[in-house]
């Protein structure tokens, strides 16, 4: 049969060409609309369509389950029950009368046509063979005309054969059609019978499954019997003496004996372990550090294999050896695994990369100048004169206790000033001020000279590699000595330009204003030499100079912008805190919408009060900023806990002696972050070996009810620095008589804490000798035992006082006077030069020549 086009086939099967092409593609035959299909491809397509029609919408699919329980004996002799479920699926097709008839007719027509084509092909082949034989027998002398005649004859015969076949096909088609009608009737009858016998068939399937299960059980029983029979035969056979086999069989027999109750129960399930043929390469995720055992677990191999590989690479370690990221990566890659390096701060790196850094065009910025020096040397007064304000007048105790950031516009140019405290407790503040500054102005009083905090300021400036300008203040005083200041500073490598050094010295008076303009000129000249520049566009970066909690506005941070533009509405990430900027205020308290480089501003909108010195970064996504902040907080907490739990010999001995140490528990509240850091640091330095300062709570803002409750529970004192307690806290403090103290000057706070620590010190006892008596004779008393007849040689002997007995100037006994008599009369004391009888409690070994030393114990107050 010749090839058929897809259009003809679609008409025959009654399927659209598109669906036909789709079905052909499913079975792996790619065709287009104009293509032809051969007989083999047609047969495959028809089989596919027939199987697809089996599970049509009129198909009923039923599942049958047969359950059985098996008992399996384990290694320990115990039996384990296993549920076995056999599932069987049956499909029942609804017989659609017209569709089935048409489909069967089509199918039979196709079969009939296939049979005809095959018979015709066979006849043609035979006919061609006969012609070839005839032609071979004929001689070569025949002409071409005879060949043409033969060919004409052959063609005539072909036409006759075709006519004959067509007539034959029409007759056979009628017969086949009648047969198909009969077959369809038989199928309908059988389908009805299947529907009637639905319950019967399902029952038969269930019975069949049970029979199969019973057969398996019987086979297992037979096998079990054979094993026992073979064992008995081997046991009786004297020639069989292989020890290894005997032991193994005895072991199996004993096991069977133990489980004799269940020996008839079959074992159908068996677990088989197959060893992997090749090494499986895995994706190994490695963080910053990993132990050898964890690395082995991730690669799904034994730890010994990893250690072997490490030794080959020249790394010696145990199973608990901690590997760094690079080493672990080398080992894993050496063993053929793919390494995925996990960075814990990946989100932080991502958020920092996704920032608009501006056009990278730098512009000249104002210098950041830090004023440093000893306390009361006139730092704030000098700044007040420059700013034309009176800050020092309003400050408690006349001393600065926080970093003040101010932006001053002068006729010569703009300068940002940072005023730092000079007290020794504010070391951290001063060092932080130097880290963010460009120039340091060292203020030294002409009448006072170089002081401890002056030296400390010089050290901070040198560490930060910042140029120092020396301002010699208070030159208006009569006792000022400028040359003495210059000579003192020379010891610390601060030399004036006049003396061949690098530092500029300016004599000023904060009171009269003398030399102030010269100082400003020098600052701007130094800034010009430094060529201070910063990018003025893009997302801002800065540093927290100071932070505090405002009762009405919430957490507030004073931020000095380093580069970019800090705008209202920006999302900022600041240490452990984050937030969206709600408000920006300058040093004068005026609200601004943006701030550029070297401009200090107050930022409102952070989640909590940040730490001074934290870096402020503007980011795009607030959600990611929150995640980074919480991650930083968690890492800091983990680090703190790991340091606390670190055990060594020193800590162990400290814990043993801990009971002998007194603790002064303190809850500290301050107005700003810088003061809080300074006070807590100074308090912890006051701790001694006998009295420890323990700060159980510290924070920024007023004293709350929570602070009062914590003080009550932990028996602590509450210290408030420039803050007050609220109403609810006052109620608890008054009702429970808690110790609450307010301070505005750091000196007073430290002095009172020292006094409280002195009260906690264990008292010191001193022995004061009040009299000496020499033993001249001894005699016995029925009431007191041995009595010493003595002469008082020095001081006064008092009754019931503690005594020492000395023999050859060595203390041999320490006790108490029990009896003191003179001329048979009890007395309370005997003075120098008189004789007396002394009875000593629980001691009878008194000899002539011993000296009795009488003393009294006095309690001495200790000072820190």
Swiss-Prot record:
Domain tr-type G residues, every copy: 364-533
GO MF terms held by the record: GTP binding; GTPase activity; guanosine tetraphosphate binding; translation initiation factor activity
Descriptive protein name: Translation initiation factor IF-2
Spans annotated as Disordered: 140-179
PANTHER family recorded: TR-TYPE G DOMAIN-CONTAINING PROTEIN (PTHR43381:SF5), TRANSLATION INITIATION FACTOR IF-2-RELATED (PTHR43381)
Species in which this protein is naturally found: Buchnera aphidicola subsp. Acyrthosiphon pisum (strain APS)
PROSITE patterns: G_TR_2, IF2
Region (G5): 509-511
Keyword DNA-binding belongs to the record: no
SUPFAM superfamilies assigned to the protein according to its UniProt record, in alphabetical order: Initiation factor IF2/eIF5b, domain 3 (SSF52156), P-loop containing nucleoside triphosphate hydrolases (SSF52540), Putative DNA-binding domain (SSF46955), Translation proteins (SSF50447)
Main location: cytoplasm
């Amino acid at each position: 049969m010749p090839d058929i086009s897809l259009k003809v086939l679609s008409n025959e099967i009654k399927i659209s060409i598109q669906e036909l092409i789709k079905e052909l593609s499913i079975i792996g035959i790619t065709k287009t609309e104009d293509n032809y299909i051969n007989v083999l491809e047609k047969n495959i397509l028809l089989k596919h369509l027939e199987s697809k029609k089996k599970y049509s919408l009129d198909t009923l699919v039923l599942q049958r389950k047969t359950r059985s329980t098996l008992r399996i004996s384990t290694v320990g002799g115990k039996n384990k029950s296993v549920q076995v479920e056999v599932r069987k699926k049956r499909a029942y097709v609804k017989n659609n009368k017209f569709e089935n008839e048409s489909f069967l007719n089509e199918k039979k027509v196709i079969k009939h046509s296939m049979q005809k084509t095959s018979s015709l092909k066979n006849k043609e082949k035979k006919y061609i063979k006969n012609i070839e034989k005839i032609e071979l027998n004929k001689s070569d002398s025949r002409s071409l005309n005879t060949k043409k005649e033969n060919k004409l004859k052959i063609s005539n015969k072909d036409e006759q054969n075709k006519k004959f076949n067509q007539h034959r096909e029409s007759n056979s088609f009628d017969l086949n059609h009648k047969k198909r009608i009969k077959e369809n009737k038989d199928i309908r009858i059988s389908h009805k019978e299947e529907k009637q016998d639905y319950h019967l068939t399902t029952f038969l399937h269930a019975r069949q499954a049970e029979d199969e299960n019973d057969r398996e059980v019987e086979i297992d029983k037979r096998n079990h019997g054979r094993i026992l029979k073979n064992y008995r035969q081997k046991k009786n056979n004297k020639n069989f003496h292989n020890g290894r086999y005997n032991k193994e069989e005895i072991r199996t027999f004993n096991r069977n004996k133990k489980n004799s109750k269940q020996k008839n129960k079959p074992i159908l399930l068996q677990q088989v372990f197959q060893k992997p043929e090749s090494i499986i390469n895995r994706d190994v995720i490695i963080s910053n550090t990993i132990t050898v055992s964890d690395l082995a677990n991730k690669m799904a191999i034994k730890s010994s294999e990893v250690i072997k590989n490490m030794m080959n690479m020249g790394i010696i370690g145990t199973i608990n050896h901690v590997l760094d990221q690079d080493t672990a990566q080398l080992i894993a890659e050496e063993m053929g695994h793919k390494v995925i390096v996990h960075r814990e701060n990946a989100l932080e790196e991502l958020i920092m990369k996704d920032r608009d850094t501006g056009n990278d065009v730098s512009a000249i910025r104002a210098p950041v100048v830090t004023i440093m020096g000893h306390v009361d040397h006139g730092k704030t007064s000098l700044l007040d004169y420059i700013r034309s304000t009176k800050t020092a007048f309003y400050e408690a105790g006349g001393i600065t206790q926080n970093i003040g950031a101010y932006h001053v516009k002068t006729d010569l140019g703009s300068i940002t000033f940072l005023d730092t405290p000079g007290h020794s407790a504010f070391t951290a503040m001063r060092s932080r001020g130097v880290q963010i500054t460009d120039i340091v102005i060292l203020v030294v009083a002409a009448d006072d000279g170089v002081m401890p905090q002056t030296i400390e300021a010089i050290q901070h400036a040198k560490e930060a590699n910042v140029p120092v300008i020396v301002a010699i203040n208070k030159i208006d005083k009569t006792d000022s000595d400028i040359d003495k200041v210059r000579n003192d500073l020379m010891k610390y490598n601060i030399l004036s330009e006049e003396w061949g050094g690098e530092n500029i010295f300016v004599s000023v008076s904060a009171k009269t204003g003398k030399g102030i303009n010269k100082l400003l000129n020098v600052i701007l000249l130094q800034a010009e030499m430094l060529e201070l520049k910063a990018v003025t566009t893009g997302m801002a970066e800065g540093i927290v100079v100071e932070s505090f909690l405002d009762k009405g506005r919430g957490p507030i941070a004073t931020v000095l912008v380093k580069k970019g533009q800090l705008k209202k509405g920006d999302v900022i990430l600041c240490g452990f805190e984050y937030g969206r900027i709600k408000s920006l205020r300058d040093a004068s308290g005026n609200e601004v919408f943006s701030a550029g480089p070297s401009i200090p501003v107050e930022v409102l909108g952070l989640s909590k009060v940040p730490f001074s010195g934290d870096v402020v970064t503007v980011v795009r996504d607030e959600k990611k900023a929150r995640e980074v902040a919480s991650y930083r907080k968690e890492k800091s907490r983990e680090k703190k806990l790991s340091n606390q739990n670190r055990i060594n010999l020193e800590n162990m001995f400290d814990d043993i002696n801990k009971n002998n140490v007194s603790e002064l528990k303190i809850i500290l509240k301050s107005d700003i972050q810088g003061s809080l850091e300074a006070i807590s640091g100074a308090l912890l330095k006051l701790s001694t070996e006998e009295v420890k300062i323990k700060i159980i709570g510290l924070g920024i803002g007023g004293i709350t009810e929570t602070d009062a409750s914590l003080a009550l529970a932990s028996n602590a004192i509450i210290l408030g620095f420039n803050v007050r307690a609220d109403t609810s806290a006052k109620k608890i403090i008054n009702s429970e008589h808690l110790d609450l103290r307010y301070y505005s000057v750091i000196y007073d706070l430290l002095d009172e804490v020292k006094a409280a620590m002195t009260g906690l010190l264990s008292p010191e006892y001193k022995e004061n000798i009040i009299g000496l008596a020499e033993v001249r004779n001894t005699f016995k008393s029925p009431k007191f035992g041995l009595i010493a007849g003595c002469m008082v040689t020095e001081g006064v002997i008092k009754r019931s006082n503690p005594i020492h007995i000395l023999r050859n100037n060595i203390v041999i006994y320490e006790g108490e006077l029990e009896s003191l008599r003179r001329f048979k009369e009890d007395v309370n004391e005997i003075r120098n030069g008189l004789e007396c009888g002394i009875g000593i409690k629980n001691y009878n070994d008194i000899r002539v020549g011993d000296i009795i030393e009488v003393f009294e114990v006095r309690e001495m107050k200790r000072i820190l």
